[in-house]
Structures are given as C-alpha cells and as structure tokens.
Amino acid sequence: MSKILIVNSIYYTEIANLLLEGATDKLKGSNASYNVIEVPGAFEIPAAILFAVKSKHFNYDGYLALGCVIRGETDHYQYICKGVIKGLNEVVMHNTVPLGMGVITADSKDKALVRADKDKKNIGGRTASAVLHMIDLYNKLR
C-alpha cells in the first residue's frame, strides 16, 4: 500500500476544498493511504514537501501538491508560479521522489473553479492518478 502526503494550499479556500475532494476521492478508490497538511499559499508547497522528504519521522511513497494561483494586475502571479514550479522540480530532481503537480494557474477564479471541480476538469483527481502512476513507475525502475 502506497502512502501519500497531500500538501494543500488554502489561500483560495473554495478551490482548495474542490482540489482536495477530487484527490481524496481518487485515492480512496486505490490501494493508497494519505495524510493531508495545509499551507497558507502555493509558494509554501515546495518547502512543506521538502520538510517531509527530509524528515526522519515520516516516510511517504509520493507527494501531491495542490493549490491555485490566480493572475492579478501585477507581476506577482508570474513570480509565484515560477517559484512554485521551480521549487517542486528541484524537490523531485534532488530527492528522486514521485510527485503529482496539481497547482492550478488561471486567469480568473471562475476558470480555476472549473479546473478544480471534480465533476468538470478534476485537477485534484488527475493529479492523484499521476502520483499513483509515478509511484508504480518508480518502484518498477528501482
């Protein structure tokens, strides 16, 4: 049985709840257990995952990054998006861990809600499927 850590950014609560619902529904239908931790925003996701990867007290087979960044009127959106993607990529590349990237980047809250809703785009569920696939691949290639 695979054990997965879900790191959920709660900055946009409604979107966070939808992402988490999609992900946990998918994981409940698999042979995986999971724990959920919350972080304040998307930028904090890579650090939280790295904390868990480096922890001597926890051992996860894979990680799920859930969150949302919505474009505003300043460059902040671009910096946050680039920082999150770069941070997650560095965690994966430097620690060889399976990770599903479910951080929505959208031009509006309405577009983000469509992507998060499990009855529509279901990014949370898709990301859970991706991490399960990567855990299987990792175990086959080790």
UniProtKB/Swiss-Prot annotation:
Q: Which reaction does it catalyse?
A: (2S)-2-hydroxy-3-oxobutyl phosphate + 5-amino-6-(D-ribitylamino)uracil = 6,7-dimethyl-8-(1-D-ribityl)lumazine + phosphate + 2 H2O + H(+)
Gene of this entry: ribH
Show the Gene3D superfamilies listed in the entry. Answer: Lumazine/riboflavin synthase
**For this UniProt entry, what's an example GO CC term?**
cytosol
- Biological processes annotated in GO: riboflavin biosynthetic process
Q: Which InterPro entries match?
A: LS (IPR034964), LS/RS (IPR002180), LS/RS_sf (IPR036467)
Q: Which family does it belong to?
A: Belongs to the DMRL synthase family.
The molecular function terms of the Gene Ontology recorded here are: 6,7-dimethyl-8-ribityllumazine synthase activity
Chain residues that bind 5-amino-6-(D-ribitylamino)uracil: 11, 42-44, 68-70, 101
EC annotation? Answer: 2.5.1.78
Q: In which pathway does it act?
A: Cofactor biosynthesis; riboflavin biosynthesis; riboflavin from 2-hydroxy-3-oxobutyl phosphate and 5-amino-6-(D-ribitylamino)uracil: step 1/2
Q: What does this protein do?
A: Catalyzes the formation of 6,7-dimethyl-8-ribityllumazine by condensation of 5-amino-6-(D-ribitylamino)uracil with 3,4-dihydroxy-2-butanone 4-phosphate. This is the penultimate step in the biosynthesis of riboflavin.
Q: Which UniProt keywords apply?
A: Riboflavin biosynthesis, Transferase
- What is the protein name given in its UniProt record? 6,7-dimethyl-8-ribityllumazine synthase
Spell out the catalytic residues: 76
